Amino acid sequence: MSRYSPKEFAQQIGSGLLSFPITHFKASDLSFDEAAYRANLSWLFSHEAAGLFAAGGTGEFFSLTAAETDRVVRAAVAETAGKIPVIAPAGRGTAESIEYCKAAEAAGADGILLLPPYLTEASADGVAAHVEQVCKSTKLGVIVYNRANQVLDENHLERLADRCPNLVGFKDGVGDLELMTRIYARLGDRFTYVGGLPTAETFALPYLTMGVTTYSSAIFNFVPKFALEFYAAVRAFDNAKVYKMLNEFVLPYIQLRNRKRGYAVSIVKAGMKVIGRDAGPVRAPLTDLTDAEIAELSALVSRVAEVEKLAA
C-alpha cells in the first residue's frame, strides 16, 4: 500500500530532483540482474532525490515483460524501504495499462507514470478516454506523460482533472512552449509538472518559469552530485551557473547522445560503465556506445570529477 495519498504524492515529487535509474541486465543472457540493481539503488540513495521512476523509459520499460517490470518495481520498493516514493510504469494498451497499475499497487509502489500507448495513432478524445480509464482503475496518484502519440491539451487535461482526482502529475515530453504555457495557465497548481524531454537539464531553466519545478534526470545515474548541483542552480535562478554547467558537461553530452537514435538510454548505461558501476548492455533494438564513444564520454565525465569525487 502506498504511503502517500495522490495529493501527498504530487507534493513530494515536486519538491526535488527525480531519479530515473537504468535497469541492470546480465551480460551473459540479458536477464534482469536484481542484485546489481538493488546495490546501485542503495548507492543512489546516498544522494538526495525526491522520487524514483522504476522501469521507466531510461529503465528500458519498452523491452521488459510485464513479469520483469513487476520484479524491477518490487526490487525498487524493497530497496527504498519507504525513504522516497517509487513511481511504477504503465503503458501499451488500456487493458495492459490497467494490469500494470494493479501490479504496481500490489508491489507497494507509490504512483504511476502513464506512458503513451504503443504504436497507436488516436485522436485527443481517444487518448483522454484511455487516460481516464487507467486513472479510474487505481487508487495511486498518476502522472500522465505527454509525448509522442499521447498528447493532450489544456481542455482535455482540465476535464480529466475534474473526473479523476488521482491524476495529479503532468510530465511534458513534447517541448511545445505555447502548449505548456496554456496548460499551466489553465490548470495552475492542480498538477505537479515534471520535465520529461531527453536530457531534461537542457530545458530546466525556462521550464521552471512555466511551473515545472522538477524533472527526471538521467545523468543523475552516473554524475549524481553534478545533477543535484545543477538542479539547485536552476531552482535558485542562478543563470550564470546553469549556463556554465550546460557548457561544461550537458551540451557536449547531448552532442554525443545524438550520434545515434536510441542513445538517450545507451549513453546512460555507458556513463555507469565509465564510473565503474557497469549495469550491463542495453537490450535490442537499442545498441551500446562504441569503445571510442565510451572513451569520449569518459573524458567528458572527468571534467566534473572534482564535483563527483568519484574515487570517494
From Swiss-Prot:
It catalyses: 5-dehydro-4-deoxy-D-glucarate + H(+) = 2,5-dioxopentanoate + CO2 + H2O. Signal peptide: none annotated. Pfam families: DHDPS. SUPFAM superfamilies: Aldolase. Its EC number is 4.2.1.41. Keywords: Lyase. One of its GO terms (molecular function) is 4-hydroxy-tetrahydrodipicolinate synthase activity. Pathway: Carbohydrate acid metabolism; D-glucarate degradation; 2,5-dioxopentanoate from D-glucarate: step 2/2. One of its GO terms (biological process) is D-glucarate catabolic process. InterPro entries: Aldolase_TIM (IPR013785), DapA-like (IPR002220), Dehydro-deoxyglucarate_dehyd (IPR017655). Belongs to the DapA family. NCBIfam families: KdgD, PRK03620.1. This is Probable 5-dehydro-4-deoxyglucarate dehydratase.
